[in-house]
Amino acid sequence: MAAVVVAAAGGAGPAVLQVAGLYRGLCAVRSRALGLGLVSPAQLRVFPVRPGSGRPEGGADSSGVGAEAELQANPFYDRYRDKIQLLRRSDPAAFESRLEKRSEFRKQPVGHSRQGDFIKCVEQKTDALGKQSVNRGFTKDKTLSSIFNIEMVKEKTAEEIKQIWQQYFAAKDTVYAVIPAEKFDLIWNRAQSCPTFLCALPRREGYEFFVGQWTGTELHFTALINIQTRGEAAASQLILYHYPELKEEKGIVLMTAEMDSTFLNVAEAQCIANQVQLFYATDRKETYGLVETFNLRPNEFKYMSVIAELEQSGLGAELKCAQNQNKT
């Protein structure tokens, strides 16, 4: 079976090698795999620890001050400072309500999340995705015909179309892919019952979580902290567009993406896109089981399981390494 071809333009060569190795059953970015939950000294990851986490007996803070201080201590707070402050000024009640929800969330055991309400929040947000995406500069109704002449390429073979697709995007700062029809069918069928999932993006400070939500053949991603603080007003920061127009005749599905470059670069968007196939196109029951748990049994879901699976796969390892090198 043909391997999934995923590439990132803009000089992200290592990402191409990383994915090509992964979907041929190889893991070229890590010399040896470790079992889930095992980390060698050379592969230690730094996770941000909430200051003042040792609360006195009796539970949460007596006012919203502690919750707000905790929010500001989030290593990704600066990225969303303006949006959070705008919400605080325009709708103080909504701002306080979200702080209260965060206070309830931090009472839960580490690694667990009682997130039934959060799943509902993500589902409610779906209707607003299109509007918010356009407001952030994304293309409205991005069709395959807006990229190239469909009638013209129908005369070509699947391999020729793949080459045209790759050449077209080679000089563009974006993420793109040519997905075999059977692989896309597996992803698509699973997305119908499990349309939402969580991806972990390596950052210098640890990991940042992004929520993926299918809406038609588009897959929208938004940072988790963005949803927690802005709810339905949270805009998409990455959209993957899938085009099945040639699936039946040519046996391929074309994919490209748009991203908000103020939050993501190409390599980071690539890492998120890779995780779609890691979790939705896998033959490994335990891996897709995380997607099912997130959608069907959210109270049993463990955030750390996503990071463990990402570590096991090797995805994002080179991105993390590059970030650490830039830091030094």
Curated annotation (Swiss-Prot):
In the UniProt record, the transit peptide is located at 1-57
What are the annotated disulfide bridges? Answer: none
Domain of life assignment: Eukaryota
Gene Ontology MF term list: protein-containing complex stabilizing activity
- One Pfam family for this entry, by name? ATP11
Q: Which InterPro entries match?
A: ATP11
Question: How the protein assembles, per its UniProt entry?
Answer: Interacts with ATP5F1B; involved in the assembly of the F1 component of the mitochondrial ATP synthase (ATPase).
Report the function annotation for this chain.
Has a complex stabilizing activity in the assembly of the mitochondrial F1-F0 complex.
The UniProt entry's sequence similarity note says: Belongs to the ATP11 family.
By what name is this protein known?
A: ATP synthase mitochondrial F1 complex assembly factor 1
